[in-house]
């Protein structure tokens, strides 16, 4: 008899469904199941913003200390023990709240994920600026969902500026909504760029500027790709380009730019290895850039002019 009662209770909800009635399903389960992508993005944006600002304030307190300097790809590619400390702080903070997400960091930390969410983290973007107490360094935290950039947060501690973005939230700086520049003429464009850490590319980049400078308003070199992209997103510069970036350099900035009404594109060399007939694509994921890619960001009405300028400037990093 107890078994028959047990079976009846299990079959009864099914009978209700078959009779056209809906069982009262656990409401918590329904809410979890029906969580919209916007809600997920907002949760991730809030978390990324908190992480960037919390870590950035701690990093700023270490300014002026004697740091252990090492180099990576070249003597100009600096890393300090604070970069590594910041990376550890951020990854521990993320994993404590989102243990199933994938995490990829500049200084080598990699945590394999179990879902469709991936974090790209630059613990200090613009380390040389940090070493010199120059304000152009930042903490950069980007998030992809289903291999598409969705969320970003960049915090510049010495300027106390927190940029954050998601598709449902737009892009803000310290809570104020921002958007890309309305400049639509290349000759009026202020363009930011960065230089390679590799000496063999720096000469080429200097030569490229000879063909670029006469056709634009001016060039700015601030020393950190993340903050450069934040500057595009809020209209402080009209465009940005740089060769040889990595996913963690641009992930957060990508979210800022596209949710501020801008666009990011990637110029890849042709199969023969040159840029005379390059492949030019709209960037969907920061994973789509490679060692020889040129990343370009601006407003949608200026992007084609910037890309054409770069191609016509005889760029060659082979």
Give the positions of each predicted feature:
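Serine residues within intrinsically disordered or low-complexity segments
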Residues: 4-6, 27
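An extended, acidic
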Residues: 179-318
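Residue-level signal for inorganic ion chemistry
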Residues: 59, 83, 94, 127, ...
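DPxDG-like acidic metal-binding loop motif
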Residues: 113-172, 187
């Amino acid at each position: 008899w107890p078994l028959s009662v047990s079976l009846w209770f299990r079959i009864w909800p099914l009978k209700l469904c078959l009779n056209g009635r809906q069982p009262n399903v656990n409401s918590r389960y329904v809410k979890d199941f029906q969580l919209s992508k916007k809600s997920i993005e907002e949760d991730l944006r809030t978390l990324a913003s908190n992480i960037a600002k919390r870590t950035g304030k701690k990093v700023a307190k270490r300014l002026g200390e004697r740091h252990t300097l090492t180099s990576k790809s070249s003597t100009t590619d600096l890393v300090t023990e604070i970069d590594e400390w910041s990376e550890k702080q951020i990854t521990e903070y993320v994993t404590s709240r989102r243990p199933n997400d994938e995490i990829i960091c500049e200084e080598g930390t990699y945590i394999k994920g179990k879902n469709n969410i991936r974090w790209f983290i630059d613990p200090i973007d613009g380390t040389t600026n940090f070493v010199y107490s120059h304000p152009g360094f930042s903490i950069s935290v980007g998030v992809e969902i289903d291999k598409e950039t969705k969320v970003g947060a960049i915090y510049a501690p010495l300027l106390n500026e927190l940029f954050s973005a998601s598709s449902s939230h737009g892009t803000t700086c310290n809570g104020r909504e921002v958007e890309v520049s309305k400049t639509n003429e290349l000759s009026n464009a202020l363009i930011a760029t960065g230089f390679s850490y590799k000496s063999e590319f720096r000469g080429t980049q200097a030569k490229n500027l000879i063909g670029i400078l006469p056709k634009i308003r001016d060039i700015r070199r601030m020393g950190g790709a993340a903050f450069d992209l934040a500057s595009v997103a809020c209209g402080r510069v009209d465009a940005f380009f740089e060769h040889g970036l990595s996913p963690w350099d641009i992930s957060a900035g990508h979210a800022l730019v596209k949710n501020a009404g801008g666009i990011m594109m990637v110029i890849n060399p042709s199969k023969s290895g040159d840029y005379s007939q390059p492949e030019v694509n709209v960037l969907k994921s920061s994973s789509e850039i490679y060692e020889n890619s040129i990343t370009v960001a601006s407003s949608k009405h200026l992007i084609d002019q910037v890309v054409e300028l770069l191609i016509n400037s005889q760029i060659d990093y082979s």
